[in-house]
Amino acid sequence: MQINIRNEIARELNVPTTELDDSLSFTALGGHSLSALRLVSICKRIGLSLAVGELLHDIPIKDIISRSTGMYDTAGSLPILENTDPSHPDVSFNAIITPSPSPSGPSTGCPTPDTLDTTDSQDADKISIPEMQLSLIQSTLANPGNNILAYHYMCSLADLPATRMAWQQVLEAESIFRTEFRIEHEGGYLVDTGFTPYRWRDTQVPNWEALHAERDKRPSFDNVAFEFQVITVAGDNSVACILWHVHHSFIDGFSMQLVMRKVSRVVAGHPVEAGPSFATVAWERDQIIKEREADARRYWKSQKRVLEAAASEIRMPRCDFAPRSIEFWNKVATFVIDVAQSDLLGYAARHHVTVPSVYYAAWALVLSIICDSNLVLLGVVMSGRSLPVPGILDVIGSLVNTLPMGVEVELGMDTVGFINRVFRQLVQLSSFDWSPPEHGYRRQFASVLAMQFDVGGHTGTTNEPSSRMNSEIPISITVESDQVIHLQFAPEYQETQVQLMGTLFTRAISCLAAAAENPEACAARLGAQSMSYQELDRWSDCVAVHLSMYIDKGAVVCVHASPCMHWLVAIYGILKAGGVYCPLNSKLDPELRNNMFQSSGAAIYLTPSASETKYRPRASRYVWAVEDLLQRQDDNNQDEFDHIPRAEGNAYLCFTSGSTGKPKGVLCTHRGLVAFQRDLEVRLHAQPGRRIAQTMSVSFDGSIHEIFSALSYGATLVLPTPEDPFSHLYDVDSCIFTPSLAATLDPSDYPNLCYVYLVGEQVTQDINDRWAASVALYNMYGPTEATCGASIKCLLPGRKVTVGRPNPTTRIYILDRNGRLAPPGVMGQIYLAGVQVSNGYIGQSDLTNERFFPDSICCGLGERMYATGDIGYWDGDGDLICLGRNDRQIKLRGFRLDLDDLEVRISKLPGVTRAAVSRRGDDLVALVQPATACAADCRKHMAAVLPTHAIPRYIIPVERFPMTPIGKLDYRAIAQTADVRYSATPSNEMSPTEQRVAAIWADILNMDRAQISRDSNFLAAGGHSLLQLRLAGRLNRAFNCSVPITDLVKAATLRDLSQRIDKLQEQACWKAQRLPPKMDKRAISRMEREWISKYEGNTSNTSFTVSFACRLDSAVDLARLKQSWDSVMEAHQVLRSRYCACAERYERVFSDHAPVAQRIAECRVLEEINRPFDLANDDLVRVVISPDTLLVTISHIICDLTTMQLLLSDVERVYDGAEPLGHRPMYMAADAWQRVAADADLAFWTSYLQDCPHSKAKRESYAGTSRVGIVPRETVLALEDFMRSSQFSHHQLALAAVALALKPNHDRIDSVIGGPFLNRWSEADMNTIGLFLEPLPFRIQFDPKAVPNADAHAFLQSVKCSSQAAISHAVPWQELVCHLGVTPEFPNHPLFETMVTFHTKGGGLSLQIDGIEPLYTWSEGAKFGLMCEFTTLSNGDILLRLEYDQGIYAPRDISIIENRIMTALRLLIKNVPWLDLIGELHEVDGATVCVTPGHKGSLFLSPLKRT
């Protein structure tokens, strides 16, 4: 049995059995997923069992064979098919398909062969069409012509008759080609018609160019069918083109292989062999799918988060209105991979992956660029034939499936690791290649990739696809077996864009598969002792000869480093022996030295002197003293040791301290070190005759710089003496200092110094000015990981300090978060690239993968780049400005925060001397010193200087901060401090006031009371401005005192708010009970007075209404509905109001009779809703009821949306049998009319609106119209996720979008936009009938140049701050206008002419009576120059109505504004960089605009509860 398996594996891999290396894995020998599937099927036929998963994983062949077991026939065993030909088609992914989420219909019981073969019975058992076939058919029905394959190949004219006959025999033998796909209401079914519609057309063309044109013509059908065409060229009697147009539901790439092979066999004279019945295979496959459904659902559930978060939208400009080409087929771009197939196969074998995984990994890399995301979604074409169904690998028919796969592109991951991960994903995905979308996924990807292997009989040219097909997927990629890539693209993409995609793809694939002259000169000097270059050479030869007997090339050798001659000899001896030098400071703690030695992987420890061997690490295998080795050399008279190091080999290993205290060993190469020191200035001006001081720590790479600069270029290295480590500075030309050391030294003490290099720390201006006046002063920047240094700058006194420009052999990039080059002046992370970049960290591959990766900017050099973690930018002179580390820059709940900057700002607060801030999940933890600091006071001070999202949730005064073993702040321990301090804090530790406030918060925010702590923030917990108003009312009622809205906005936490309430109660600002003031019933409110002014002299006042309309069905009792309305209108005196002129003012007059509802036969809503009101003579409420419609229209002078909802709620109660609420508070007794603006609030508005812009357009009347659109669904879904995770309100988001839409071409934003202010200040006000709503101006200001790395969220944050400031200082509208000295000139609105409103799902009008369906309506006219009204429907859709004055805006202008708003919403939610945001808004202006009518649109009277 095992011999049989071995033979089959060898045959499948095309390897002689005797040469099969069974110690390797299947993939290492060249196997892939399809060959594994084929091998499993072949073994089944001969009674052997293998698993595809075993074959694809990195398991030796011998282990697979030893674990295999035979399969023995029983009564229920699988039949052994007669066809045992092992040569199955080598394809599973060949044709690009058009997926659809439509699920397949239900199937019935198992059919018998008789019923399957029945052709004259219409009652045969129904076999469900496989889901993918059904989706292809449905897609074609929706878009005729889609999913029709055009397959062509060239055939000899002499063979044409036999070929035609062979095609006919093969198609007639296969059941799929006589199958009808019957679509019924309950699903789709396979029906055997008993007839094969075999059609051929013959066409002759004059030349080959015409042949190509004929071949590319549209098929003669556009539905589910197939036909053949033979195209010949006149005068050419050699070949013909056979063209087969066939719908994808009949055949997939796998089946095409089978069909072509069968046709070839019949042409060769073999009898035709019918394959298994497709209906039978489909039915049995469907049964197994049902059995495994739970497994599939679990798998897709595990993938849900990744798939939902992955990006698939290609961020390239598209023409959404691109005209359809006169050509039927989508265009195809062709590319050739410049890597040999054998090289790819070898690569895949070495790393135990498959070649397709390389292609999928490469395309994922491309998507990460063109989708601007590190998590991308792509479509994977699978055979759908992995299930154990008899005949599934032999059946003709379409079983192909296209599945989504999310790939995370981690910038720090090495190439091999990335491809291996993609390979594992593909293997796992292939286990579910049969799973339909109903199991828990959606086919919503913008690109799909398929592999296509050799097709028997195909002799087409290599630069054309053998098949093509139009689909709804924008980008379809096919990789042919000859390494030609065909990229088929939708019309909305430009060819230049597709060329870029293809070029990136092919490049991504390619990137985955480049002292003797002065022997007596002094090399080194230590006090009176010296060593010549000849001595250094001879002595190091001795060490090298000895080491070479014990180490291999590239082995690390550690040295007990201390400044002496034998130390230098040890270094060069190691390098000559081909080893890697690793210095371990003689002053190291023994335990740390031992740990470093173990990390290095060394076995040998060299010491300069014999007395130092006692310091050998415990882990060392050998220890030798250089002085002993030199004595042996003298005794034995060794010959010269000849060694030429490899340029790419490692030269030295230098340990740097890690952030966790664990040292990192950095491996640097000979090539990098030599390149670094080629420049004279960089190498410390080292040359013969120059003296270079050795001052840097012997274990620091600064000493490497000193040693090799001096000794590689003939200079003398001057070592420090132990007694006076700085005395040698009096006698040298050049040296390296840290700025800290330079600060302690006086330049005048060292007159011989010519060149001083500062490294390791930032240089202060003071140090620069002192030293640059005396010596040539250089500032060098560069971490160990880039071989000593990356940039250099010659500093001058009084000039700004920078780190200069790159060394000649280093490239420096400033990259943004997406790895793109940042413009000059814009901050980003500093990346170092080029030959100097080291080989990473020894023994820490994960850390290496996080920081080192191929150079993505200069891709053609095959070099790497290193992410330094430092932030910097290029200044105006082209110099690099380094600002420090970026490890502490985080994104918290959508906001960027620099924790280091936050620490500095908190440290400057009163009573705080030092602060340390760490992240704990979605919260911040701040430790402050001294321990006596008051956390509550800290929080108050923070609220004054920090945005809400930057205020730590936990503020803990401590005596000392947690530290790591190497003396750094331990931020992990800091975060855990919050767990220790707060884990045992029960809710009953809250004060009584805090507990009551927390209960009210929980109710208003609809959240669990246990989630609210004393440090909770209302906005962070999901609150917004309207909920703050509701909270104010609840608190007023609960505590019987007036809690100003300003207190709610300013309170950072629940504790702060509770303390403020306690103070208000102590002050007894309000009595527990107070009587409404006495007043004249005829008086009118401030807002009523303003509306009267608007009515005066304006005939176009149809927009001055609030309306509600709904559709009624037969379940509604019309008489009871009328009675309910009459009762409610009778109960509220304010609804009888009329307004009459009396002398020089207006007074309220109450009608003797309340308004009553009118029953009419037909309600003409459009006409009725636009009928104006006469304030003096008309009832200002109209309720009209027809058999199918209810329309309520109320003048705005007595009604706002809150009042309308109160009335609807009253009607609902009365309709259900309750009494009307006649005890609602009196309108003129409302708290709102008793308010007087505070001086501080008026002062705020003076400053807030100072020098604000004003609308220049002048209105003639309130005439206008509306345009209504629907926000794209994908934007709505993204908006919902955004609102759940951010602290912005819907209205703030809308304000930001509209501000951008109105000012898209400005460098900075400064505009005043209005918003609605509820103006109801108490619970009583919230239940009062009448007009309260007032306008409130919001000033939107944003200067992107003043914000580092400005992006959409930075702009949103400025909008939020402005919005909160305006609301917290809200004053009566008329007082504000008067205070600012503005005289209203209606119809021009004071202060602003644009209004923005946002009605959320819970804030819309509702009448909960069975049989009523609310309708969307609006009236003609325009209350403002432009009003942008967002309304969320019950199904989640968002409507945007733009009400505008046609005298100011043309329909095209409004259409452009609408497009801008939609675009701005999408970009704000995605938080794109500011320049990208503005750039895409500019593109909107250039797009084709479709202008549609306003109120005549289909949304007028559309249901608000749309499905």
UniProtKB/Swiss-Prot annotation:
Annotated SMART domains: PKS_PP
InterPro entries assigned: ACP-like_sf, AMP-bd_C_sf, AMP-binding_CS, AMP-dep_synth/lig_dom, CAT-like_dom_sf, Condensatn, PKS_PP-bd, PP-bd_ACP
Region (Adenylation): 514-893
Annotated stretches, region: Condensation 2: 1099-1471
Keyword DNA-binding: no
Organism of provenance: Aspergillus terreus (strain NIH 2624 / FGSC A1156)
Example of a GO MF term: ligase activity
Species classification: Eukaryota, Fungi, Dikarya, Ascomycota, Pezizomycotina
Similarity-based family: Belongs to the NRP synthetase family.
Gene3D superfamilies: 3.30.300.30, 3.40.50.980, ACP-like, Chloramphenicol acetyltransferase-like domain, Luciferase, Domain 3, Nonribosomal peptide synthetase, condensation domain
Superkingdom: Eukaryota
Keyword field: Ligase, Phosphopantetheine, Phosphoprotein, Repeat
UniProt note: domains: AtaP has the domain architecture (T1-C1-A1-T2-C2). The single adenylation (A) domain in ataP suggests that one specific substrate, L-Phe, is loaded onto the T (carrier) domains of ataP.
Pathway(s) the chain acts in: Mycotoxin biosynthesis
PROSITE patterns: AMP_BINDING, CARRIER, PHOSPHOPANTETHEINE
Name used for this protein in its record: Nonribosomal peptide synthetase ataP
Record note on disruption phenotype: Impairs the production of acetylaranotin and of the cyclo-L-Phe-L-Phe intermediate.
Biased composition (Low complexity): 105-115
Residues recorded with modification O-(pantetheine 4'-phosphoryl)serine: 33, 1025
Gene Ontology annotations for the cellular component aspect, listed alphabetically: cytoplasm
Region of interest called Disordered, as start-end residue ranges on this chain: 98-119
